[in-house]
Amino acid sequence: MVKKIKEKSSLDKFFPIHSQTSKEDKIFLLNTIKLLNLNLSTYNYLEIGSYLGGSLTPFIMDKKCKKILSIDKRNLKLSDERGENYDYKNIPEKKMFLNFRKNGLKIDKIKTFNGKIKNLKKRGAKYDLVFIDGEHTDHNCYEDFLYSLNFIKKNSIIIFHDSSVIYKAISLIFIYLNKEKIPYSFIKKSESLMSAIFFGKYIKMKFNKIYGKIESTKKYFNSSRNFILLSQANNKLKVKLRWSKFFKRKYPYKY
């Protein structure tokens, strides 16, 4: 299904709906689809945090993808580790399906669950690929990962978006997997917000050939730590600046 992406128009074909993923993030997803296509005759996909459905579209298009489960806590106002707030109150599930129909995409293989994966009953299909892009807090990301383990196959991949924001959750995941003696490989894509954990037969893949340049785990953790500290400081400053507007003739910054 997926060939090497050379032009933006080619990328837009697979991602016709707006999403919060960059060009490099999208290419990472397409390369993962290519990896699955090379190793499996069919596969199932689970996504946590679908928003408008923008990251679901290449999986809808892929004939080898037989089942899709979209899990999301809709109609809520959420925040992340940076102190950023996101309002999803006006993004109902039906708006996502409307986006699919507008782009001529069939939705018969998609099922949705409005809530958290921890409340999903352990029954039915197992999944080859999970994309965790829900609430970007360390607690929620770690929780999503732990409960995702109930729904994955022995040979599977779990992808994380906004990896710099949830780097502490990733470090906790390492501790858990090492304690439980579960073999795995981890990569963080350079110049992208994507990272992934590979299980089973995918552990020994040549990731540089599949995804391109990979960032060292040490560099990833160090840069993420600095990013979060700077983001938190900037957000605190914004709050103080907003409060200062109430006071006339006062210097707007407070340290």
Residue ranges and their predicted role:
Residues 1-5:
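Polybasic, low-complexity association/targeting segments
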Residues 7-14, 34-255:
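S-adenosylmethionine/decaboxylated-SAM
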Residues 14-29:
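Conserved SAM-binding loop and adjacent beta-strand
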